[in-house]
Amino acid sequence: MQIKHLITLFFLVLIVADQCSAFLSLIPSLVGGSISAFKGRRKREISAQIEQYKDLQKREAELEELLDRLPMY
């Protein structure tokens, strides 16, 4: 093999090994996150979501009102 092929192969193996080690270190956190999601520990409060939606609707109405008051150019 020529040296340029060996260098290319070396860098390819280096990149693949780095990506695999990064993926393997993520597995424990993925398992823990999926278990807590299935058990429902991270359920959001529906009332908080409703309040956020109402606030968003209010801001949107205020923005439309403000834009209606601006003169057209």
UniProtKB/Swiss-Prot annotation:
GO terms for biological process: defense response to bacterium; defense response to fungus; killing of cells of another organism. Residues 1-22 form the signal peptide. The modification Lysine amide is found at K39. The keyword Cytoplasm does not apply. Keywords: Amidation, Antibiotic, Antimicrobial, Cytolysis, Fungicide, Hemolysis, Secreted, Signal. Changing S29K: Important increase of antimicrobial and hemolytic activities. The keyword Ribosomal protein does not apply. Its main location: secreted. Expressed by the venom gland. Belongs to the non-disulfide-bridged peptide (NDBP) superfamily. Short antimicrobial peptide (group 4) family. This is Antimicrobial peptide TsAP-1. It comes from Tityus serrulatus.
